[in-house]
């Protein structure tokens, strides 16, 4: 149905909303908790805007591991009650998401907790997301893959996974127009607008911790980056609901907007296009 509507070849939706806490973050949270247990840590910590913290809290609770989650006090933080209900200790930090990450890293150094923050044990993240690529490749050999961009970790891990299989699809990052380092650097801008909202929260990142890897993946794959405002995210959320039968987070639904813009910009309509919808609306 989407193919007919957009006039393109084949569209495949890789939907991560069925994970325990509703997003792809469960993949890396599970991997980090398992690594923390293997290495004898008594606790795990992370700085987060929400989804990753909920995932860490969930998987830590399953394994009896103490979780301390740092969040930026000024953000919407809609998943705080869920984290607390799962037994995590939540610490609100003045400032930005990046400040919460730094506070968590400092806490890990002081207490000896496992540091699950982006950039701290990135090979664990990349391995978990490269497994997503294996799953996608078992269904289709993609021409282009559209991925939400926050820190750039997911796109980087997917590219590593595809490349390991000898597959080289065009990697297209899709993010908010109002605050993402990868978007800004892709277009050669030194500064950009920043506005965190309840819809773009998973994507805003003044400092994208895996920006170098993501930009390299985009360059190697001859990919691209697109940024969109919230109204576009909401419009494509409704379109995915009505055509694909899923209930995506607006930040994840932007991948469809990315596909539409990609087709219009480059005139590429024939091919196998994969939309990585990283999260769905979750009732915790």
Residue spans for each PLM region:
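PLP-dependent amino-acid enzyme catalytic core
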Residues: 1-284
């Amino acid at each position: 149905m989407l193919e007919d509507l957009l006039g393109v070849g084949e569209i495949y939706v890789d939907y991560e909303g069925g994970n325990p806490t509703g997003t792809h973050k469960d993949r890396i949270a599970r991997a980090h908790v398992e690594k923390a247990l293997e290495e004898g840590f008594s606790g795990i910590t992370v700085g987060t805007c929400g989804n990753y913290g909920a995932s860490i809290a969930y998987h830590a609770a399953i394994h009896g591991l103490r979780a301390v989650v740092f969040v930026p006090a000024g953000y919407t933080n809609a998943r705080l009650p869920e984290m607390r209900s799962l037994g995590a200790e939540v610490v609100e930090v003045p400032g930005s998401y990046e400040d919460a990450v730094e506070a968590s890293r400092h806490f890990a150094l002081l207490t000896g907790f496992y540091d699950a923050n982006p950039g701290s044990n990135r090979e664990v993240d990349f391995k978990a997301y490269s497994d997503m690529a294996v799953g996608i490749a078992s269904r289709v050999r993609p021409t282009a893959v559209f991925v939400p961009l926050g820190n750039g970790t997911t796109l980087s891990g997917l590219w590593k996974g595809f490349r390991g299989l000898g597959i080289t699809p065009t990697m297209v990052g899709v993010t908010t127009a109002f605050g993402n380092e990868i978007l800004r650097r892709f277009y050669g801008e030194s500064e950009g607008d920043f506005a965190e909202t309840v819809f773009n929260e998973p994507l805003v990142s003044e400092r994208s911790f895996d920006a170098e890897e993501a930009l390299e993946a985009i360059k190697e794959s001859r990919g691209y980056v697109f940024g969109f405002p919230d109204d576009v995210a909401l419009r494509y959320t409704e379109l995915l609901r009505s055509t694909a039968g899923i209930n995506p987070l607006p930040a994840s639904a932007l991948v469809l907007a990315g596909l539409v813009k990609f087709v219009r910009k480059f005139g590429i309509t024939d091919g196998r296009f994969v939309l990585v919808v990283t999260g769905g609306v979750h009732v915790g």
